[in-house]
């Protein structure tokens, strides 16, 4: 029995949450396995892919949510994703939870070089993949920043404080994990209640809303200065017929 199952009934995994995890294949890992992730593996599929223990996944998810919710200022939590599939998920996560985020290539010195323009001093770091986000994890270890990571079955756990075992290679799996993490943080803060389903759709964590894209395009067009169009080459025509009549 896990710590969450033996503790409060409120934090236990519901059947609907388990169905969401299975539908998005959050429990399907890779064919490789690291020694550090061995304790999170339940079995293997017929194709050879490792199966992650869903109960341990949920236990670590709740632990990570409690750590994030305990930070007084949400901006002190930085969410990073060098993996392209995770940029949309961390954007929506930061939008709902209020954290800072860093998508795309992590610029070296973001946590260690104080003269850098985008220098940050977060209290907690959340990464999508310990392999692709290795630079952020290494810099966090130099300045004593706790690290929460979504870890697949072959992930290295060096300098990772809280490893959430899950499938971090699929866009839908990443979106579901950040959706569940955001929902749990908001519940712990008291922003939303547990008795009412969260209105935010998980699809928006990996697909872009067409209405949102249209609104951003219209706002960008309104903010851009109108280009001045001049006809001809800009010369000034004048009539010199009476120039010698003076």
UniProtKB/Swiss-Prot annotation:
One of its GO terms (cellular component) is cytosolic small ribosomal subunit. Disulfide bonds: none annotated. One of its GO terms (molecular function) is structural constituent of ribosome. It is found in: Cytoplasm. GO terms for biological process: ribosomal small subunit assembly; translation. Required for the assembly and/or stability of the 40S ribosomal subunit. Required for the processing of the 20S rRNA-precursor to mature 18S rRNA in a late step of the maturation of 40S ribosomal subunits. Component of the small ribosomal subunit. Mature ribosomes consist of a small (40S) and a large (60S) subunit. The 40S subunit contains about 33 different proteins and 1 molecule of RNA (18S). The 60S subunit contains about 49 different proteins and 3 molecules of RNA (25S, 5.8S and 5S). Interacts with ribosomal protein S21. This is Small ribosomal subunit protein uS2. It comes from Leishmania braziliensis. The lineage of its organism: Eukaryota, Discoba, Euglenozoa, Kinetoplastea, Metakinetoplastina.
């Amino acid at each position: 029995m896990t710590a969450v199952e033996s503790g409060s009934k409120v934090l236990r995994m519901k059947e609907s949450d388990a169905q969401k995890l299975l539908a998005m294949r959050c429990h399907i890992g890779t064919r490789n396995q690291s020694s550090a992730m061995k304790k999170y593996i339940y079995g293997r599929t017929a194709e050879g892919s490792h199966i992650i223990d869903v109960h341990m996944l949920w236990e670590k998810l709740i632990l990570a949510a409690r750590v994030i919710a305990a930070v007084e200022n949400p901006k002190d939590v930085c969410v990073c994703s060098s993996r392209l599939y995770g940029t949309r998920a961390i954007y929506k996560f930061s939008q709902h939870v209020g954290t800072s985020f860093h998508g795309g290539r992590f610029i070296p010195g973001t946590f260690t070089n104080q003269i850098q323009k985008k220098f940050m001093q977060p209290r907690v770091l959340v990464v999508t993949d310990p392999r692709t986000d290795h630079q952020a994890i290494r810099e966090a270890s130099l300045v004593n920043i706790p690290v929460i990571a979504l870890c697949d079955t072959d992930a290295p756990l060096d300098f990772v404080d809280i490893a959430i075992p899950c499938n971090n290679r699929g866009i839908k799996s990443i979106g579901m994990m950040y959706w569940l993490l955001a929902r749990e943080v908001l519940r712990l803060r008291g922003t939303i209640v547990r008795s009412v389903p969260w209105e935010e759709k998980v699809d928006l964590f990996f697909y872009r809303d067409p209405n949102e894209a249209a609104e951003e395009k219209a706002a960008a067009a309104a903010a851009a200065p109108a280009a001045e169009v001049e006809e001809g080459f800009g010369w000034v025509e004048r009539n010199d017929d009476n120039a010698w009549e003076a």
